[in-house]
Amino acid sequence: NAADFLIPVGRIKAHTDFRGEVESGICKMLVIGMGKQHGAYQCHKLGFKSMAANVKEFAGAIIEKKPNMFAIGLIENAYHQTCRIEAIPAGRILEEEPPLLDYAKSRMAKIPFDQADILFVDETGKDISGAGMDPNVTGRSPVLGISRPFFQRIAVFDLTDKSHGNFGGLGSADVTTQRLYRKIDFEQTYPNGITAAEPLAVRLPV
């Protein structure tokens, strides 16, 4: 309440665990990012089935309480390059974020075939995706019912340094390396899995 202005800045993109009018973006940042672990837990405990509606409803309440703000939405292309920047007044966030999400989905990375025996992933990491490996790209998710692309096995070779040992999402892989395992910090990772109610995401592959 002491702040004169609130200016959330964040990427608008497809979420790794739920579908809706708003997914990863300004609304989610207001509810879960700024809410930190307590805010994230309050939203996640209601389940992913209603997550999109809850994020939008909670964000609306925050905007109503804090009207002296505007948001900056960033959209990246398939090469993690910023391709669009939008400044959005507080009163238009709920209206303008959904079409920006549609645009972001049209620009996201895609694997150019639907099926293969094995997918080799050079690096996984929280700086790449909140799920380490983006299920929207790999087709592997402990939550979403994704059928394509389909890979019989997924092998992950390394963890990005910027993840600081957080291996969240590695549970979607079948095989990994000792090199990656040596970088793991369980104390950094497990609170994410517990807060998000996704224990499968933080299990270890072979």
Regions found by a protein language model. Name each.
Residues 2-125, 139, 147-149:
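Conserved, well-structured core segments that form the ligand-binding/active-site neighborhood
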Residues 129:
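Hard-cation-handling environments
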Residues 135-206:
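C-terminal non-catalytic interaction/assembly regions of soluble proteins
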